[in-house]
């Protein structure tokens, strides 16, 4: 049984989260807190497996409460955030301070019963993932923080006009907003490849995600926009709610195209992005699949490898959730399997082959 403590100042939200969580017979809500002070006291008393944490609460906000729970190593914390730009900035601050991951608040933008079921499934799945990691999250976080390199200022902006000869197509999901910092900040600014990243997240969260990632990286990080000409030494991040596609124009330039066809469970989809990159770059594609639930991108890793490209999958040793990389490995789509703290090294080696 997974024991969960809910923290939210809204009685309606506490009730809604309780109903969602207890629809799973293996989850038990052991208590609820209405402010930051209350959740810290109850977390110490109940010793739950997971805490769901609202950000904006009276007396003591969720960010402050989070730091107490993380520093005392009580349990993983799942942030429950409003789907706004302001909510996104605070949520990414929480992830940097040690939160496990985040989910959008149920209600609000949910417009149908099918949407509600999708939101409920995401919350339950992330609670399950957090609970599985209760005893090893702290160890991994200590290791990750210890190995994280100092932020290096960008040495030089990308030089427009350079030909793009190789591409790195990266996919990540659950745990990704935090763990991606073990990879992309280590990529040098002179890397001779364009980089693409799909991270499953709500539309309003992408600008804040890109802003914080860009501040931590040596390479330029920008949100993928329709019509942008692709340059080497730049990381293009797929927008929430839009698929990231590539096309070649008549001049031979690689251009970004966006679409929002509801033909995949996730939008943006790792598979859509990887297949599009493969179509343009063929055997000069490097596929990278990291932590995440499900199998988005697994078949595309197989296709990249069969086309002569290089594929890198995160190992079970470091994966928050081994679903996506594990599926790629099972299908024979991973040439290289390493923990996340070695992925940047393997990307650089692959580009330089």
From Swiss-Prot:
One of its GO terms (cellular component) is cytoplasm. GO terms for molecular function: phosphorelay response regulator activity; protein-glutamate methylesterase activity; protein-glutamine glutaminase activity. Phosphorylated by CheA. Phosphorylation of the N-terminal regulatory domain activates the methylesterase activity. The modification 4-aspartylphosphate is found at residue 54. Residues 3-120 form the Response regulatory domain. GO terms for biological process: chemotaxis. The keyword Hydrolase applies. It is an enzyme of class 3 (hydrolase). Residues 158-353 form the CheB-type methylesterase domain. Its EC number is 3.1.1.61, 3.5.1.44. InterPro entries: CheB-like, CheB_C, CheY-like_superfamily, Sig_transdc_resp-reg_Me-estase, Sig_transdc_resp-reg_receiver. Contains a C-terminal catalytic domain, and an N-terminal region which modulates catalytic activity. NCBIfam families: PRK00742.1. PANTHER family: PROTEIN-GLUTAMATE METHYLESTERASE/PROTEIN-GLUTAMINE GLUTAMINASE, PROTEIN-GLUTAMATE METHYLESTERASE_PROTEIN-GLUTAMINE GLUTAMINASE. Belongs to the CheB family. HAMAP family: CheB_chemtxs. This is Protein-glutamate methylesterase/protein-glutamine glutaminase 3. It comes from Syntrophomonas wolfei subsp. wolfei (strain DSM 2245B / Goettingen).
């Amino acid at each position: 049984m997974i024991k969960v403590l809910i923290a939210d100042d809204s009685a309606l939200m506490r009730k809604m989260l309780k109903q969602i969580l207890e629809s799973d017979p293996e989850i038990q809500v052991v208590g609820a807190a209405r402010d930051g002070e209350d959740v810290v006291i109850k977390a110490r008393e109940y010793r739950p497996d997971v805490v769901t944490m609202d950000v904006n609460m009276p007396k003591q906000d969720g960010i402050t409460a989070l730091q107490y729970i993380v520093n005392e190593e009580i349990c993983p914390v799942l942030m429950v955030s409003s789907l706004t730009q302001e909510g996104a900035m605070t949520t990414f601050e929480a992830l940097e301070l040690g939160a496990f991951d985040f989910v959008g608040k149920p209600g609000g933008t949910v417009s149908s019963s099918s949407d509600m079921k999708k939101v409920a499934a995401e919350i339950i799945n992330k609670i399950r993932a957090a609970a599985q990691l209760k005893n090893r999250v702290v160890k991994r976080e200590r290791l990750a923080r210890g190995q994280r390199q100092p932020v290096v200022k960008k040495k030089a902006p990308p030089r427009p006009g350079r030909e793009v000869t190789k591409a790195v197509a990266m996919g990540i999901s659950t745990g990704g907003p935090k763990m991606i910092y073990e990879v992309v900040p280590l990529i040098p600014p002179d890397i001779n490849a364009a980089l693409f990243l799909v991270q499953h997240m709500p539309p309003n969260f992408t600008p804040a995600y890109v802003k914080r990632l860009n501040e931590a990286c040596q390479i330029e990080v920008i949100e993928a926009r329709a019509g942008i000409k692709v340059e080497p030494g730049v990381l293009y991040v797929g927008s929430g709610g839009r698929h990231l596609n590539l096309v070649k124009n008549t001049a031979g330039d690689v251009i970004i195209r966006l679409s929002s066809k509801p033909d995949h469970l996730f939008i943006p989809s790792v598979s859509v992005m990887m297949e599009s990159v493969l179509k343009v770059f063929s055997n000069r594609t490097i596929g990278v699949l990291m932590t995440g639930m499900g199998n988005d991108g697994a078949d595309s890793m197989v296709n990249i490898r069969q086309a002569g490209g290089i594929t890198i999958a995160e190992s079970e040793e470091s994966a928050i959730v081994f679903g996506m990389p594990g599926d790629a490995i099972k299908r024979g789509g991973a040439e290289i399997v390493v923990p996340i703290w070695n992925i940047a090294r393997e990307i650089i080696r692959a580009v330089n082959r």
